[in-house]
Amino acid sequence: GHSFSASVLPYEPKGNQHLKRPEICLGTDPVFTPDDLLAMANEYFTKAGLEVAVNTPFAGTVVPEPFYSLQDKRVQSLMIEVNRGLYMDERTGKKKETFEEVKYCLQRFLKVLFLQKK
């Protein structure tokens, strides 16, 4: 996963300037992100009370090159990007009181995902 700034940064595309930043951005790949994985993640984070967007403000995911080249559909990938405004004061870099809650939410998602994929 990654995190992103609560405000638009200078290097971002001009089209992002007007967009409201979601709390969670789910980055996908047309080959490696199956619909059921995306739906499950979207539902989980939405039910957790978080605002979710897909491929906004950032798109894509990471797949190791050997698998990407082969387009091996046994490999699944989803990028979970967290708005830093959820868990830290970006001006000072200090954790907010919500840090542990956000961390737990992400840990719980991974547990749910792992159990579902068994």
Show where each model-derived region lies.
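Catalytic cores of processing enzymes, dominated by hydrolases/peptidases
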Residues: 1-87
